[in-house]
């Protein structure tokens, strides 16, 4: 079930403070965050946000198409190594 429209999008307060400081100061350094649950707001457009994927921070450059999605959608947590090869087919 999706979030109620009357509540509005969720974004962590500490992330909003960092974004406001970056926009006001014209700082180009990536904003580090562990908040994968935060919704991308229009204020984030043009910023690089380093989202934690459980192991490291993945830089995500925010564009207009990303608004309304969650930050965690753009930092993949699982690495796919490929399926096991069939030993009979190799011979």
UniProtKB/Swiss-Prot annotation:
GO MF terms held by the record: rRNA binding; structural constituent of ribosome
Listed Gene3D superfamilies: 30s Ribosomal Protein S19, Chain A
GO CC annotation, single: small ribosomal subunit
The keyword RNA-binding appears for this protein: yes
Record-level GO BP terms: ribosomal small subunit assembly; translation
Protein keywords: Ribonucleoprotein, Ribosomal protein, RNA-binding, rRNA-binding
One Pfam family matching this protein: Ribosomal_S19
NCBIfam families: rpsS_bact
Chain's role: Protein S19 forms a complex with S13 that binds strongly to the 16S ribosomal RNA.
Stated family: Belongs to the universal ribosomal protein uS19 family.
Protein name: Small ribosomal subunit protein uS19
Organism: Cupriavidus metallidurans (strain ATCC 43123 / DSM 2839 / NBRC 102507 / CH34)
């Amino acid at each position: 079930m999706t979030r109620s429209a009357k509540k509005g999008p969720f974004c962590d307060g500490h992330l909003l403070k960092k974004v406001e400081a970056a926009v006001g100061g014209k700082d180009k350094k990536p904003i580090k965050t562990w908040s994968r649950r935060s919704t991308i707001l229009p204020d984030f457009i043009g910023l690089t946000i380093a989202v934690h994927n459980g192991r490291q921070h993945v830089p995500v450059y925010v564009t207009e198409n990303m608004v309304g999605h969650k930050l965690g959608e753009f930092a993949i947590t699982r690495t796919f190594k490929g399926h096991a090869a069939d030993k009979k087919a190799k011979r």
